[in-house]
UniProtKB/Swiss-Prot annotation:
Subunit composition and interactions: Forms a complex with TatC.
Annotated GO biological process: protein transport by the Tat complex
InterPro entries, per database record: TatA/B/E, TatA/E
GO cellular component, one term: TAT protein transport complex
UniProt protein name: Sec-independent protein translocase protein TatA
GO molecular function, one term: protein transmembrane transporter activity
Gene this chain is encoded by: tatA
Source organism per UniProt: Alkaliphilus oremlandii (strain OhILAs)
Transmembrane segments: 10-30
Length: 64
């Protein structure tokens, strides 16, 4: 999920976020980030389904 980020890099990023946003703001920030990622995945899935449907329609048109 995080590409080639290792544990030490993730800990460093979390530490920097803790310094910048403070401990009180991190749960809210994490919740917002999780929601944004979820919405992006949902949107991505919809786009893939639309493309697949359009592709099937185009293939059916060509085969007729």
């Amino acid at each position: 999920m995080f590409g080639k980020l290792g544990t030490s890099e993730l800990v460093l990023i979390l530490g920097i976020a803790l310094i910048i946003f403070g401990p009180g703001k991190l749960p809210e920030l994490g919740k917002s980030l999780g929601k944004a990622i979820s919405e992006f995945k949902s949107f991505s899935k919809e786009v893939k389904e639309d493309i697949s449907l359009d592709d099937k329609k185009a293939n059916n048109t060509l085969n007729d």
